[in-house]
């Protein structure tokens, strides 16, 4: 069978699609992925055929960019957002319509769902969606509502271009919940209450490629030579103020007598001097390194949050007011395996206090207990692939 997978965003947004795509490819299917141009190399490195669409996504969650947007006139922000989305949606429609010709199923994410649904209807094939958090837990502000209206107008125009009648409701066959059910108790029962009014929404757990990095062996050797460190990472799309960030981390860990492992990601920490209790690398394999750490501090991406929970260590989420990051901060707090704070309010003093709290034995004990309830990565990928195969066969 032929599967078209399309996801726009950073590595954290794209990797779940690549993980299930790689499994489908292993099973003998034809798989093609549509991603932002800056993610094309990543997809191809995983052995998948890729097609680029839309503008570069690397700056969308950049901390400086987000901070500057908050300081701008709302009109300027709106114009910038409209320009970006107009370009993205136009390329998205053209690219996906072409790729879906001859496909058996289209898999996409929540932001692209409405446009993908039109393409799937036009091609007469089923549509599946990957959800990284419950979409009913996300409440857009005024700008988000304006964008929603823009999207609806664009969707209507797309349907007219494709010769489709006016949409009457959701046309998704399958919505895979790529996170753990335990993170949102009651959600499965809520979906069941709606019965046939909603698509199938199975929980499979987080989807990851678990790719090794060049730094893994070096980092594990450094960890083995001393006490277990605290991991600090900021995701694949976030740049931070390097000098201030390293100084804040170094000061807090020194006060607590802890070592710090900092993964710089897109930020350049190489020129910044740091103390002997701090090690800086670009990236590590979470599955290999997290279990050797005392705790994990990160931005609150769905994938990193799941990796920390699977490793059975406490979590501190320093979130930006974008996407699902505040949602995952609330999850670790509710499960009592961590704490959340907005990144912009973090100081050396607050970081010291927050780390002291989550390093308490009771947090570690609860984190270990939650880890036993998490789905294994290989099982998550296999379950997602099974669901997609079954949906594609039914749609033939």
Regions found by a protein language model. Give the residues of each.
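Phosphate/nucleotide-donor binding subsite
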Residues: 49-104
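Active-site-proximal region of nucleotide-activated glycan assembly enzymes
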Residues: 125-186, 191-199
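Donor-nucleotide binding loops and adjacent catalytic segments primarily
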Residues: 182-295
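C-terminal amphipathic helix plus adjacent low-complexity
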Residues: 348-396
């Amino acid at each position: 069978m032929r599967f078209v997978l399309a996801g726009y965003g950073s590595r954290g947004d794209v990797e779940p699609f690549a993980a299930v795509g790689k499994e489908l490819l292993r099973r003998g299917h034809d798989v093609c992925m549509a991603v932002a141009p800056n993610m094309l190399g990543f997809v191809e490195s995983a052995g998948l055929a890729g097609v680029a669409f839309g503008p570069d996504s690397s700056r969308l969650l950049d901390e400086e960019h987000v901070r500057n947007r908050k300081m701008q006139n709302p009109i300027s922000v709106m114009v910038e957002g409209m320009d970006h989305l107009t370009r993205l949606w136009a390329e998205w429609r053209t690219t996906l319509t072409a790729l879906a010709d001859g496909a058996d199923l289209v898999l996409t994410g929540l932001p692209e769902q409405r446009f993908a649904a039109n393409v799937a209807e036009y091609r007469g094939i089923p549509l599946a969606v990957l959800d990284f958090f419950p979409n009913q837990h996300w409440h857009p502000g005024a700008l988000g509502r304006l964008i929603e209206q823009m999207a609806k107008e664009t969707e209507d125009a797309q349907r007219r271009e494709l010769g489709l009648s006016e949409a009457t409701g959701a046309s998704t066959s399958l919505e895979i919940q790529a996170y753990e059910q335990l993170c949102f108790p009651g959600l499965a029962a809520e979906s069941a209450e709606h019965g046939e009014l909603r698509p199938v929404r199975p929980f499979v757990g987080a989807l990851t490629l678990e790719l090794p990095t060049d730094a893994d062996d070096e980092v594990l050797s450094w960890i083995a030579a001393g006490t277990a460190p605290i991991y600090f990472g900021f995701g694949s799309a976030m740049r931070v103020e390097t000098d201030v960030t390293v100084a804040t981390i170094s000061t807090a860990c020194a006060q607590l007598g802890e070592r710090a492992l900092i993964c710089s990601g897109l930020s350049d920490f190489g020129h910044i001097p740091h103390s002997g209790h701090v090690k800086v690398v670009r990236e590590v394999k979470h599955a290999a390194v997290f279990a050797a750490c005392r705790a994990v501090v990160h931005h609150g991406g769905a994938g990193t949050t799941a990796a920390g929970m699977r490793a059975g260590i406490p979590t501190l989420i320093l979130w930006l007011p974008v996407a699902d990051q505040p949602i995952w901060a609330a999850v670790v707090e509710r499960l009592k395996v961590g704490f959340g704070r907005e990144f912009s309010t973090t100081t050396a003093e607050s970081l010291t206090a927050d780390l002291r709290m989550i390093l308490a034995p009771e947090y570690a004990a609860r984190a270990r207990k939650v880890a036993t309830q998490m789905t294994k990565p290989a099982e998550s990928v296999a379950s997602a692939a099974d669901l997609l195969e079954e949906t594609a066969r039914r749609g033939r």
